[in-house]
């Protein structure tokens, strides 16, 4: 019997949570990862290697999908100290991806090589072969370019789009990305930052078109917390409305939302300064936009913060896959 094909689209720290749990299931996995990050280590590397697609999100996905020994993972994720000169703040894995990207001619080729080297379960694709610049248009008409600048701007985002960071060419999807979406049985969006992790992938026209054309079940894992500079005062229904608006029509079939209350002591704005309050649940609003709403306890409290429990999310995804067979 053919294994179900599940593709996860996103970036940041959210997608790896789902991918890590999917590895334990009898499915074929693919990850499509944003290349619009311009902050931190990825941003510094982009300045020095203009052809490089930012490696940070790809690095985290690679670790999540790999069966590398724990020590290898610690080496790959090791971040140089602040007194390490030009290397300060860079994870070793980012430098390895950057070096292999240059050696292999592209980040796409580098990820295929690293996937073999670290025995990943599934395929990893950058959403585009070229670094992208994310642009946000705010409701007051202001436009801000660059992911790191967008989150610092005070205002309500109306829409986002991406441009090729190297030239005026239209951003194109990376090799095999469109085919992977069209051949999938399920597409999972999120969890992750709505405007800076998920949308930078799907506003690439080829990817957006593929999502509208695919026969796959499309599931969106809504964030647990609102995010400063992105989704302040958002309900879960608002998140879905934004996604649908960017592609011009509804395309999400299922939404998974956490309804377990986050204890006040886990809303640590000092440690997790981008998070504000728990996303408000709007069941009626969701039902108007999608055919299936799964409201449950998907909460994992860890290290002083509120996160998704990947195993609980994936269990629900597998139930949907079984029903669709």
From Swiss-Prot:
Pfam families documented for this protein: CofD (PF01933)
Record key words, sorted: Cytoplasm
Main subcellular location of this protein, as a coarse class: cytoplasm
Record InterPro entries: CofD (IPR002882), CofD-like_dom_sf (IPR038136), Gluconeogen_factor (IPR010119)
Gene Ontology cellular-component terms listed: cytoplasm
Example GO BP: regulation of cell shape
CDD domains per the UniProt record, alphabetical: CofD_YvcK (cd07044)
Cytoplasm keyword on record: yes
Subcellular locations according to the entry: Cytoplasm
A GO molecular function held by the record: LPPG:FO 2-phospho-L-lactate transferase activity
Keyword Cytoplasm among record annotations: yes
Family: Belongs to the gluconeogenesis factor family.
Matching PANTHER family: GLUCONEOGENESIS FACTOR-RELATED, UNCHARACTERIZED PROTEIN YVCK-RELATED
Job of this protein: Required for morphogenesis under gluconeogenic growth conditions.
The protein, known as: Putative gluconeogenesis factor
Organism: Streptococcus pneumoniae serotype 4 (strain ATCC BAA-334 / TIGR4)
Organism placement in taxonomy: Bacteria, Bacillati, Bacillota, Bacilli, Lactobacillales
């Amino acid at each position: 019997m053919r294994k179900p094909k599940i593709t996860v689209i996103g970036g940041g720290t959210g997608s790896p949570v789902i991918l890590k749990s999917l590895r334990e299931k009898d499915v074929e996995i693919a990850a499509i990862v944003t290349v619009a990050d311009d902050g931190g280590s990825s941003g510094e590397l982009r300045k020095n290697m203009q052809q490089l697609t930012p490696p940070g999100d790809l690095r985290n996905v690679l670790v999540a999908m790999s069966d590398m020994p724990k020590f290898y993972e610690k080496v790959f994720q090791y971040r140089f100290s602040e007194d390490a000169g030009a290397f300060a703040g860079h994870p070793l894995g980012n430098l390895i991806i950057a070096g292999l990207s240059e050696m292999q001619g592209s980040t796409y080729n580098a990820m295929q090589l690293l996937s073999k080297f670290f025995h990943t379960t599934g395929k990893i694709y950058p959403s585009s072969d070229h670094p992208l610049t994310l642009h946000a248009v705010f409701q007051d008409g202001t436009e801000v370019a660059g992911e790191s600048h967008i989150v610092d701007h005070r205002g309500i985002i109306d829409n986002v789009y991406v441009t090729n960071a190297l030239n005026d060419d239209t951003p194109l999807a990376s090799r095999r990305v469109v085919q992977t979406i069209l051949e999938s049985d399920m597409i999972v969006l999120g969890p992750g930052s709505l405007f800076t992790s998920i949308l930078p992938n799907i506003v690439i026209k080829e990817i957006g078109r593929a999502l509208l054309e695919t026969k796959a079940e499309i599931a969106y894992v809504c964030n647990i917390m609102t995010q400063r500079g992105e989704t302040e005062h958002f309900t879960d229904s608002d998140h879905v409305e934004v996604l649908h608006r960017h592609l011009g029509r509804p395309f999400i079939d299922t939404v998974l939302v956490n309804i377990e209350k986050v204890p006040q002591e886990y809303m640590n704005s000092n440690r997790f300064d981008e998070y504000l309050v728990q996303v408000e649940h709007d069941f009626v609003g969701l039902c108007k936009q999608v055919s299936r709403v799964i409201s449950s306890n998907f909460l994992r409290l860890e290290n002083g913060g509120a996160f998704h429990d990947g195993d609980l999310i994936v269990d629900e995804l597998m139930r949907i896959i079984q029903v669709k067979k």
